[in-house]
């Protein structure tokens, strides 16, 4: 697909603007995805407000965003499992594909992984992205593209629940009702935990936790 696309670019701390760039051409093993939704993560805000997270320092111009969902609009010649029109969620970590961990399906442990919106790798606050087809996951009909964009943070919550061996009949407390706290609460409920309580100091967040299924909430600023 030829043409230009709009890209939201971080031009400095607290400074955003738009650029026009060429729509990327997918390689044989890639698909071109027209992005419909990209979540705004806490790390995006941190980079925007401070210009760095630890040793990862933004060198403008830089593109933020790593929680994308969209529609396949072009398919590389080697891609067989996706077609134009498929709605997909994108894995934001790009891996080598041939190390022992990648071959075992544990590609999150790849020593050469690079991540959308982690300097120096640009993110996806843009209209299109070419991405490895094996890292694009087709969404079922009962999952919207908006929900697909939230699979990345949801996976963090499920990983926490799995690591904690959450199971039927347990009680659990989640400290913090930000995005990750809320999806962790939902993951605990999905794994059968009987009672999940959420602690925060912001009433609006606690209200959202109750709306999403918490069994109870505690305002840490008001209660011991």
Model regions: which residues?
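Adenosine-nucleotide cofactor-binding segment
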Residues: 174-177, 189-224
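Glycine-rich beta-strand-centered segment in the early N-terminal region that forms part
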Residues: 24-38, 53-100, 140-142
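Phosphate-coordination loops involved in phosphoryl transfer and adenosine-cofactor binding
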Residues: 4, 168-171, 193
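NAD(P)H dinucleotide-binding glycine-rich loop of Rossmann-like/cofactor-binding domains
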Residues: 96-175
